Amino acid sequence: MSKRAFNFCAGPAALPDAVLQRAQAEMLDWRGKGLSVMEMSHRSDDYVAIAEKAEQDLRDLLSVPSNYKVLFLQGGASQQFAEIPLNLLPENGTADYIETGIWSKKAIEEARRFGNVNVAATAKPYDYLAIPGQNEWNLTKNAAYVHYASNETIGGLQFDWVPQTGDVPLVVDMSSDILSRPIDVSQFGLIYAGAQKNIGPSGLVVVIVREDLLGHARSSCPTMLDYKVSADNGSMYNTPATYSWYLSGLVFEWLKEQGGVEAMEQRNRAKKDRLYGFIDRSEFYTNPISVNARSWMNVPFRLADERLDKAFLAGADARGLLNLKGHRSVGGMRASIYNALGLEAVEALVGYMAEFEKEHG
């Protein structure tokens, strides 16, 4: 097998080699059963065991309290932009949203289709380079919920604190930083995360929802989008994304073997410190994000001369450093350094960046 490249894609993102090797070994014959997980009935005892173990491992990793349901759903995080208000926003109610970038803005735009949305705070006055402190927020009394994105993958902003909303349920899009460090699940009413960054392959979204928030869906809510229906049917009201669920379970096993989210926090801190440290010491590369809002997972950076961007990307590709091009809406470069990428990937990137700077700086 040729050497594996370092994949810095924002999503679908790198998966651990050990997980892919395990899936490869089990592809044609899962544990002597003579068939692939792809071919299993989702109602079979074997597949139900796979699904239940994946859920339990995720519960263990995040210390999910017993009064929360863990759902493995379809449609990705973007479908949750509609599913959340359909389940949690009464027709005459108001939901508060915090806008810190493109993904939280998309959530706001979708929620407005279903009811009243109050944008309680926005990072726009800071040019999306910093997150407004909660003392700047204009929260609605008795809001149905407060929604925010803990990490903006495109802009590279991340909350390093959890908003305090009292009795109002806190809803968070953790698509790009879930499992990257410990969290207190009990601080949230609902957590959702598209799988294709830190959980597994695309086609799946994980929802962790407090039980008291179930059963309030609008009468017009499609059955497939009703959290209570999903919870009552073990996320199997219809055929789930079985292989994505299975692969996510392998990732959870790998995370536990690595020492859990506590070990991931140490690993991720070392990676982001190395990369941001190099950028800050350089006179050729820049990252403009406020230091206390810098993402641990998605590191955008620019070259001193954007005319060199194509040469930089070509050289990176030639060295097996893939998918470093920034999002089309912001340009520049972006290195996504999720759990599956180790420090050696960041060291390889920094080495190339130093070499390129020496040649072109």
UniProtKB/Swiss-Prot annotation:
It comes from the Bacteria. Its cofactor is pyridoxal 5'-phosphate. Keywords: Amino-acid biosynthesis, Aminotransferase, Cytoplasm, Pyridoxal phosphate, Pyridoxine biosynthesis, Serine biosynthesis, Transferase. GO terms for cellular component: cytoplasm. Binds 1 pyridoxal phosphate per subunit. The keyword Transferase applies. L-glutamate binds at R43. It holds the Pfam family Aminotran_5. One of its GO terms (molecular function) is O-phospho-L-serine:2-oxoglutarate aminotransferase activity. Pyridoxal 5'-phosphate binds at A77, S78, W103, T153, D173, Q196, N238, T239. Its main location: cytoplasm. Homodimer. Catalyzes the reversible conversion of 3-phosphohydroxypyruvate to phosphoserine and of 3-hydroxy-2-oxo-4-phosphonooxybutanoate to phosphohydroxythreonine. PANTHER family: PHOSPHOSERINE AMINOTRANSFERASE (PTHR43247:SF1). This is Phosphoserine aminotransferase. The gene is serC.
